[in-house]
Amino acid sequence: MFQNNPLLAQLKQQIEANKEYVEGTVKASDKAFGFLECDKKSYFIPPMEMKKVMHGDKVKAVVKREDDKEQVEIDSLLEPMLDRFIAQVRFNKDNKLQLIVDHPSIKNIIPANTHKKVTETLESGDWVVAQLKTHPLRDDRFLFAQVTQFICKADDNFAPWWVTLARHEQPREPVANEKSYELHDELDREDLTSLYFTTIDSPSTQDMDDALYIEPIKQGEVQTGWRLVVAIADPTAYIPENSNLEKAARQRCFTNYLPGFNIPMLPRELSDDLCSLVPNEKRPALVGYIETDLAGNITGDTRFVSAWVESKAKLAYDNVSDYLEQVENAWQPESAETKQQIDWLHQFTLARIEWRRNNALLFKESGDYSFELNEDGSVRDIHVEYRRIANQMIEESMIIANICCAKFLADNAKTGVFNTHAGFDPKNLESAQKFLLDTLSTDENRDALTAFYAPEKLATLEGYCEMRRSIDEFPEKFLELRLRRYLTFAEFKSEVAPHLGLGISHYATWTSPIRKYGDMVNHRLIKQVLLGKQAKTVEEGILVRLQEARRQNRLVERDIADWLYARYLFPMVEQAVEFDCEIADVSRGGVRAKVIANGAQIFVPFSTLHDKKEEMEFRPEEIALYIKGEKAYQIGQAVKVKLTEVRLETRSIVGNII
């Protein structure tokens, strides 16, 4: 009798029209309930509704109100949190396969089966890749997954590496070596083997991209400048443009440098041998001749040639730095020619540093952290290394070489893989100006600084550089760290554009073609120009892949480091070790502090900082926490932190500020 009843249909429409729908992301709690995080509000999800979803699911829900209390009833799934995911194996009491998702906030235990292509016998604790097959909201069935790939056994000490690489779908192995490699030369090679090229690198480095030769330019007996000859390994001479090797390099894009070892972009026979500029071996190279005056200004156009070169010496950063810094009992150059090259390159470097200080931007000095590992993958120690003068010598040589490459490609090829950085995100320009004025201005100088930090000026290369130089002497770190949050990301582009982070109008890397696919592309473009050919515009797909691969590699490096830090600090919890730290972030949940000595990040929950929540205020615009109206903690602030907990299963490190 109710079938096709228009009154009933109208009633249903009215009920539906009166429902208040919201969309958001599920946030699980330590209890059975959860929250739906929407754009401007958070709604309570009762335990029965949480059984339909998991942390991270994007859902549509209906708001229910009763006695001034709000909660939601889940309506439908918009996007599941899980698709492909990493998990550890477990078996229930009936020996049925289940998966523990490797995510700190997902507590769901997911029943699973195994795809037929997985041939390993799974045991409790093993690491696997799985695919979510069913979801209660989407398939009207309970959560269920399928194991699609075995990663490693539970007791594999190298699990941090293998699991992380699998998570980000990165290869474990280098590209397989070819049976043989042939040199494909279209350009005649000049014989430059008589020039006294040297390399400066880490003692363990095998894939040496660059070698340098430098000499003074003289008019009569008076020196007027420097001639720097930059020899760069030439892998494109061995790799035909549409070969399988080229395709593999294009997919990987970068050599992946991980704690303990690297995964090269090219086969090791090329990266570590045939292309590497090892000492006393004749190698093909692409060579750039760069000339400057004594103040470091580039004079004239850079000349590129295809050549044969022979490095005469492989030098180590620390040895060269010790020699130049006159450390007691320091290493000494083994020949007069090596000594001359080091001394000349040192003088050239000092001129270029001063040139960049006045005309571009210098890097802020910060240490690089490196893990010293035992053979079984355990962490023996963590070292902080700072750039010394020898590192700066190579750095300055590579920077000027890349500036010259960018100008050459822009002028001649009209395309390239250009490294660009627009500085502040356009939507943050006014916020950046306001922050600078609030921090630096006084009643006397506010009008002048308002013009100096005008948004339209901050958006230009000149204005951005002037701003950065103006804050160089500011003693508080928070100014620099806060401004970083307003920046946009660096991008690869096929047309030349400024790199505001470097303070340079043109920048394109070509100095690491063994390690970076974009540099290989630029090598091919330089060669096309030298051959008199019309250069092909760099495909957008290449730029997109470079951007994605760079992001993936950074995530891989970060995730492995997080795991190794947790392992390293875990034994120290009982000792309640205290660390000197710097606040790296302040968020709604707490403070994240970086340990100065080793780079580990320790989370300090807000609940440990003050016992009255209502007296605490997080101010995101300052990245600061206020207690009772007074600023208590801010990004960049020095603090002392006591280690209190390390959770190995989630790789989280927790402490208290003391």
From Swiss-Prot:
Q: Which cellular component, as a GO term, is one annotated location? A: cytosol
Recorded catalytic reaction(s): these are: Exonucleolytic cleavage in the 3'- to 5'-direction to yield nucleoside 5'-phosphates
Organism lineage: Bacteria, Pseudomonadati, Pseudomonadota, Gammaproteobacteria, Pasteurellales
Q: Which Pfam families match?
A: OB_RNB, RNB, S1
Molecular functions per Gene Ontology = exoribonuclease II activity; RNA binding
Q: Which InterPro entries match?
A: CSD, NA-bd_OB-fold, RNase_B_OB_dom, RNase_II, RNase_II/R, RNase_II/RNase_R, RNR_Ribonuclease, S1_domain
Source domain of life = Bacteria
Q: Which SUPFAM superfamilies match?
A: Nucleic acid-binding proteins
Q: Where is the RNB domain?
A: 189-530
Localization per Swiss-Prot or TrEMBL:
Cytoplasm
Q: Which UniProt keywords are given for this protein, alphabetically ordered?
A: Cytoplasm, Exonuclease, Hydrolase, Nuclease, RNA-binding
The main enzyme category here is hydrolase
Q: So what does this one do? A: Involved in mRNA degradation. Hydrolyzes single-stranded polyribonucleotides processively in the 3' to 5' direction.
Name the gene that codes for it. rnb
Q: What is its EC number?
A: 3.1.13.1
The family database entries (Gene3D superfamilies) matched by this protein are listed as: 2.40.50.640, Nucleic acid-binding proteins (2.40.50.140)
Protein name (database record)? Exoribonuclease 2
- Give the record's family classification: Belongs to the RNR ribonuclease family. RNase II subfamily.
Where the record annotates domain S1 motif, the positions are: 576-658
Q: Name one GO biological process term.
A: mRNA catabolic process
